[in-house]
Regions:
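Glycine-centered coil/turn sites that cap beta-strands in beta-rich domains
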Residues: 1-20, 28, 40-43, 64
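A glycine-anchored, Pro-Gly-centered beta-turn/N-cap motif
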Residues: 12, 35-37, 54-57
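A short, hydrophobic/aromatic-rich structural module that often spans a beta strand
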Residues: 33-36, 72
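Solvent-exposed serine/threonine-rich low-complexity stretches and specific carbohydrate-binding patches
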Residues: 26-34
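C-terminal tail/sorting-segment detector
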Residues: 1, 42, 51-77
Length: 77
């Protein structure tokens, strides 16, 4: 998952969460303040309990301050 934090949102709390197709939270990959810049976060296909999840469609939600971006991804194993 690639995302950019613009300079006007630097040092805002940043959250990156993964959800399944039912809308259940699968994993929280980022939950901290980040400086402006480009980021690449690799999700290993594991849930909050570090267990492998099944192949399928998942959704990511990135929130920086009050700005939110969402997207869909396909996990293949």
């Amino acid at each position: 998952i690639v995302f950019t934090i613009p300079y006007d949102l630097t040092n805002q709390n940043t959250e990156l969460r993964i959800y399944d197709v039912q809308g259940s939270l699968v994993a929280i990959l980022v939950n901290q303040q980040l400086a402006a810049g480009n980021y690449v976060i690799k999700w290993e296909g594991r849930n909050q309990n570090n267990q492998n999840v099944s192949s399928g469609i998942y959704f990511y939600n990135i929130k920086v301050g009050e700005k939110v971006k969402s997207g869909k991804m396909n996990l293949l194993k």
